[in-house]
Amino acid sequence: MEEVIKVSNLTRKYKDFSLGPVDLSFPKGFATALIGANGAGKTTLMDIICGITAKTDGTVTYFGETDNADKGNVKERIGYCASQAMFPANWKVRDIALSMSLAFDKFSKDRFYSLLGELGVTDEKNSKKPLSSMSDGMKMRVFLASAFARDTDLLVLDEPGSSLDPLMRDRLCDRFRDYIDSGNGERSIIFSTHNIADMENAADYVIFMDNGKVIEQGFTEDLKDKYIALSAEPESLDKISPLLLCSSHSSSTATGLALAENKLKLEALGAVTERPTLSQLSIDLMKIAEEKRDRKSVV
C-alpha cells in the first residue's frame, strides 16, 4: 500500500493526556476517516501531521519524502480545515479570500466563491457577515470552501461534518469523492469524526482511536468482512457470549459484535448475523476499548 502520510512511533504528552505511541500509514488516493469519541486524540494527531502541534517523539513522513511539515512544498500540498476558529472573528468572506490568495500560490478565488455557492453561502446577507455573526454550520462551510479552493494533494479536515445539517453532510461526501477522483490516484483526504453515520460512504479507509491509541484500522470493506453484528434471544446470551467481543441486551433482544470467522457457530446457536455498518463498528469497538480500560483500572 502506497502511503501519503506515514507516522512512526509518534507520541505527544500532556499533563493529563498522552497520544501514542502511534504507528500508522494513511493510504494514498483514498479518504481516511479517523473515528473516535471526543478526547480520543484525533485532533492532536491531525494537528501534529499539519505542523500545528509539536510532537514529543517519533516521525511523520510526507509524500514518501520528508518529515518536515514546515517545508514550503509540503505546506503547499496540504490543505487544512479546523473544527474551531481558523480566521479572526471579525473577518468576512472577502477577507478570507484575500488572505488565502496571499498565503498560498495555488488558491483560486474563483473556485472559492464557486464552492461557497455550492454550500449555500452566496447570498449577500451571509457573505457580508463577520465570522463572529455566523452560525457554526455556516462558518464550517466557509472553512471547507477555503480548503477545497486550493490545488492540493492532501486535505486534512477536523470534524468537517459535526456542525453541518444532513443535506450539507451529503454534499460534503460528494465533494470528497470529486476531490479524490480528480486526482487520478494522487489526491487523499484525512478527516476526523466522532459520528460516522452520515459520512460512511465517504470513508474508504478507517482508523479507530481511543484514549490516544489506535485500536483498529483497515479498508472499510475489509473491516466489514472481518466482523459481524448479531442479534439473538436474551436466553441465548449465555451460550453465545464466549464468541462475542461485546454485547448488550434488553428484555426482548440481545445484540453484539463478533469476528466473522465465528459466523456459522453463532448462527447454529440461534443468533441472526449481518454485516455491520461503520457506525455499528465504531460504537462496539469503543465499547470494547472502554471495557478494557475499566478492567485495567480495577486491577
Model regions and ranges:
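Conserved beta-strand
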Residues: 7-10, 17-27, 58
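The feature captures the beta-strand-to-loop junction immediately N-terminal to the Walker
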Residues: 35-37
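Helix-to-loop junction immediately C-terminal to a conserved catalytic motif
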Residues: 50
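Conserved ABC transporter NBD signature motif
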Residues: 58-69, 73-74
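ABC-family P-loop ATPase nucleotide-binding domains
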Residues: 82-142
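Catalytic Walker B motif of ABC-type/P-loop ATPase nucleotide-binding domains
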Residues: 155-159
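C-terminal coupling/interaction segments
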Residues: 173, 244-246, 250-299
